[in-house]
Amino acid sequence: MTSRNQQLFERAQRHIPGGVNSPVRAFRSVGGTPCFFQKGVGAKVQDADGKWYTDYVGSWGPMILGHAHPDVIAAVQAAVVDGLSFGAPTEKEVDIADLLCELVPSMDMVRLVSSGTEATMSAIRLARGHTGRDVLIKFEGCYHGHSDGLLVKAGSGLLTFGNPSSSGVPAGTAETTMVLTYNDPQELADAFAKHGDKIAAVIVEPVVGNMNLIAPTQAFLNAMRDLCTKNGSVLIFDEVMTGFRVGLKSAQGLFGITPDLSTFGKVVGGGMPLGAFGGKREIMEKIAPLGPVYQAGTLSGNPIATAAGLATLKLIQAPGFYEALTAKTKALCDGLVAAAKKHGVAFSAQNIGGMFGLYFAEQCPGTYDEVLACDKEAFNRFFHAMLDAGHYFAPSAFEAGFVSAAHSDADIAGTIAAADAYFASLK
């Protein structure tokens, strides 16, 4: 009998390209039929066939409290009855701006938007407007949203400018983006030595979550900050994924680096569409209506999204919240590694706060090339075995995973036991 998931997927493909509204959801990387989810409670999600899973995707990061947290739901319900959107200032957007600037010391001012892509796109435009320069440096394997200038792959040689990695991106747009190797401070220094007076900004995921999880070296982050300062370039931390996920002060607080601009999404909206970018006052005052850099949005600062975001940001400030989140995420990683080792499976894992990476390799990778060398087919088999057992991981070997405050010790233990059984079956 055809499953409800399969029926929905077949129907979806009639009017939605690929049957999904974001490519990774189609399961093209791992194969099979995607899950259509209809309900989430705590650490669990239920698909259209009624099957429940322990969820390690968490809507790709926002659900740090788990699904349908009662305080967040109550805040949204209370806001909805007062109106869905005004296209005008509201008190809630002032409240969340105050709170964001309090929690992120590098931000003197902040502008709300509706997505992480909007946040990074706007921050880059602002950096170019502030410096009067055009060139942007990004790093291979880092994802900053789907705006044209960021859908770029590396050129053919060291310090070359980029080429489009998506159809529809003009070559001229990509040519103002330089793609370098993540965690290579010398290559970054060489780029500044050659092009320093043209570089408007460096944008980076301080912890990479879009080529699985890659931790930065402190030397790399320090070099980035020093080189931007010396050359008058803007350092942009893309904290859309890491913001309030790796710690209350985000990645910049964890690693002790002060960026000039920061972008946020995911956790700040508590599951609703909300993003933000902010930073130094002298840069932020270049944005319209104060300055010449234009940025706008009909739904920016939406009162329902800000209600969810405020409720979430208040709850994550509870004493011990991040210590507990980090401990349970580490317990998951350590347990999976121990299970794999027991059965002779090449496997490694690591976490930073509530983010984690799983790799079918002897050691955790530190670069994009090392990620590509991991055994993707082994991951795909693991993914489907765990899905069958009721444990939902990201449907791609190149995506980080997430643990929420709602995950219990029993949830973690159950996932480790399922992995142990799968690894044992490989003998």
From Swiss-Prot:
It is found in: Cytoplasm. PROSITE patterns: AA_TRANSFER_CLASS_3. It is an enzyme of class 5 (isomerase). Pathway: Porphyrin-containing compound metabolism; protoporphyrin-IX biosynthesis; 5-aminolevulinate from L-glutamyl-tRNA(Glu): step 2/2. Its cofactor is pyridoxal 5'-phosphate. InterPro entries: 4pyrrol_synth_GluAld_NH2Trfase (IPR004639), Aminotrans_3 (IPR005814), Aminotrans_3_PPA_site (IPR049704), PyrdxlP-dep_Trfase (IPR015424), PyrdxlP-dep_Trfase_major (IPR015421), PyrdxlP-dep_Trfase_small (IPR015422). Gene3D superfamilies: Aspartate Aminotransferase, domain 1, Type I PLP-dependent aspartate aminotransferase-like (Major domain). Its EC number is 5.4.3.8. It holds the Pfam family Aminotran_3. It comes from the Bacteria. The modification N6-(pyridoxal phosphate)lysine is found at K266. One of its GO terms (biological process) is protoporphyrinogen IX biosynthetic process. GO terms for molecular function: glutamate-1-semialdehyde 2,1-aminomutase activity; pyridoxal phosphate binding; transaminase activity. Its main location: cytoplasm. GO terms for cellular component: cytoplasm. Belongs to the class-III pyridoxal-phosphate-dependent aminotransferase family. HemL subfamily. Homodimer. This is Glutamate-1-semialdehyde 2,1-aminomutase. It comes from Dechloromonas aromatica (strain RCB). The lineage of its organism: Bacteria, Pseudomonadati, Pseudomonadota, Betaproteobacteria, Rhodocyclales.
